[in-house]
Design a protein with these regions (language model features):
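Glycine- and acidic
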Residues: 72-74
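A contiguous, surface-oriented mixed alpha/beta subdomain in the mid-to-C-terminal portion of proteins
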Residues: 1-37, 41-45, 50-51, 56-59, ...
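Partner-binding and oligomerization surfaces adjacent to conserved cores of proteins
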Residues: 50, 67-69
Length: 324
């Protein structure tokens, strides 16, 4: 059965993109740039690439994909009996969505949208938000689809045993309910990008690997929901403080009354923390490096253990007898 790497180059720095392109050429791999022939064709070299893998990929190839795409959560893997060209046709037809006019806005018009299922940070979850018939039609091209969560734990979804291309004839309609569901998939990523862009000084997070930032963003987003912070501004504030001050900021005892007040709507978290004594912040900042090191260890240790384990123990391992 053919296996493919789906790489979202848009999440990688230019040097990483060049390394991936060089690896594709060096190993003589066939590749389909999924944005080619679509309204996003000018971004074909930066958008998702579907790369057909050899029957037995070399260690060097897998290392290239891991170091330059996987570490950025820009890599997923697909198993499908479809040929590369047929699978690419299927995938391209599922890139377009259509947001209908808002009936509450006079003169509003429909607009197109890119369905970012190729982004492994949210992609494997996205079809689960679609209507059942659309989800089944999309997934029947795959036997399986695998990626890694924010903590690099493996995630796999099963498709169909009998694969066939099922291209869409028109964009997928995106009503308000579906748009909200898709937006919620991306909450942590959106907030992290906003914090990086708007709320940090140059170099402030350089001590923290991007993968660790992403892991903490998801943890802090989960913490916000667990603590009942329903307002986007309060969730954002908790995430920003966690990245800038202390990764376990949600557990800080001195902040619990303020977090509780924000959860009930009594006072926003941003306004409440203005009254926190400077000594509290200083204690949190001084304790942060040790706690951050523990989070880093917790993120990396499972990866080290998987590297040391037998190949057959890997969650994505396919025995030779099943490789065609």
């Amino acid at each position: 059965m053919p296996r493919y790497a789906l790489v979202e180059l848009g999440q990688c720095e230019m040097a990483e993109r060049e390394a991936i392109a060089l690896g594709v050429r060096a190993h003589g791999l066939e590749v389909e740039r999924l944005f080619e022939g679509t309204p996003e064709s000018e971004l074909a070299d930066q958008g998702p690439w579907l790369i057909q893998l050899p029957v037995q990929p070399s260690g060097a190839l897998l290392e290239t994909l891991a170091l330059h795409a996987g570490v950025h959560h820009a890599l997923s893997m697909v198993g499908s009996s479809l040929a590369l060209g047929d699978l690419a046709i299927h995938m391209r037809s599922w890139l377009e969505g259509l947001i209908p006019p808002d009936p509450t806005i006079e003169g509003d018009e429909s607009c197109g949208a890119v369905l970012r299922w190729f982004d492994p940070r949210i992609g494997l979850e996205m079809p689960g938000c679609w209507p059942a018939a659309d989800r089944q039609q999309f997934m029947q091209a795959f036997q399986w689809w695998a990626a890694w969560r924010a903590d690099f734990s493996p995630r796999m979804v099963q498709g169909s045993i009998l694969n066939r291309a099922a291209p869409r004839a028109e964009p997928l309609p995106l009503d308000q309910t579906l748009l909200l569901a898709l937006d919620q998939l991306n909450t942590a990523e959106t907030m992290l990008a906003s914090v990086r862009e708007n709320d940090i000084e140059p170099g402030e997070l350089d001590h923290m690997a991007p993968a660790l930032q992403r892991r903490l963003a998801h943890q802090l987003s989960d913490d916000a929901r667990r603590l009942g912070l329903g307002e986007w501004a309060d969730q954002y504030m908790l995430l920003a403080m966690g990245l800038r001050l202390h990764p376990d900021i949600a557990k800080a005892q001195a902040l619990q009354p303020m977090i509780a007040a924000a959860a009930t709507g009594e006072q926003g978290l941003g306004a409440a923390i203005a009254d926190v004594d400077n000594a509290v912040w200083q204690d949190l900042v001084e304790a942060a490096p040790q706690v951050l090191a523990l989070h880093s260890h917790a993120l990396l240790e499972p990866l080290r253990q998987r590297r040391l384990a037998a190949v057959s123990a890997h969650p994505f391992h396919i025995p030779r007898t099943e490789v065609r």
